[in-house]
Amino acid sequence: MSTGSVSDPEDSEMRGLQRVYPAPASKRPPLLRMERGYGSPSDISSAEEEDGEEEPGSLGAAGGCKRKRLRGADAGGAGGRAGGAGKKPLPPKGSAAECKQSQRNAANARERARMRVLSKAFSRLKTSLPWVPPDTKLSKLDTLRLASSYIAHLRQLLQEDRYEDSYVHPVNLTWPFVVSGRPDSDSKDVSAANRLCGTSA
């Protein structure tokens, strides 16, 4: 039993050492992650390996998105080019200038035609006046003044009762519408009409 007595103190010493110094990690039982609260280095390395395996896939997906975006941008650029090609080209500046010049020419032609019609109307009014020398050159303003004085003279003849029996034909009037054989008082009225008409050479 001597051996047993010798072994007992050694066993007690070994137990004391085990209490003071914990067992190495290789001999300790593995703990769950929930109990430890953090992952062991081996778990971290395995997680990193899994992340490393997943990252190429994620990069590939991002690359695919970028490629899709680039393709969409290329399609949009092609659509913009197609839309730009569908627009009508602007006319050259020379054609615009020619169009404006043609419009000016048309407006000038219309104005010349209007002036011709107006000149014909004034010439007819001048010939309708009773006795105007043919060599007399009258402006448009003088023609209008003579016509207004002639109309005023005819109205005066119609309003006066004393000329009912002795009707004076306009042909007997002399330019500028002076009635021969009329009294002096009537000649004053005619002179006032002459002042309205004005003298013309």
Curated annotation (Swiss-Prot):
Coiled coil region boundaries: none
Keywords associated with the record: DNA-binding, Nucleus, Repressor, Transcription, Transcription regulation
Span list, region Disordered: 1-108, 182-201
One annotated GO biological process: cellular response to leukemia inhibitory factor
Bias kind Gly residues: ranges: 74-86
Biased composition (Acidic residues): 46-56
Transport is among the record's keywords: no
GO cellular component, one term: nucleus
Short sequence motif named Nuclear localization signal, residue ranges: 66-71
Subcellular location: Nucleus
Ranges where the bHLH domain occurs: 102-154
GO molecular function: DNA-binding transcription repressor activity, RNA polymerase II-specific; protein dimerization activity; RNA polymerase II cis-regulatory region sequence-specific DNA binding
Functional note: Transcription repressor that blocks myogenesis and activation of E-box dependent muscle genes.
Subunit architecture: Efficient DNA binding requires dimerization with another bHLH protein. Binds DNA as a homodimer or a heterodimer. Forms a heterodimer with TCF3.
PANTHER family named in the record: BASIC HELIX-LOOP-HELIX TRANSCRIPTION FACTOR, TWIST (PTHR23349), MUSCULIN (PTHR23349:SF62)
Protein's name according to its UniProt entry: Musculin
Species this protein is from: Mus musculus
Protein encoded by which gene: Msc
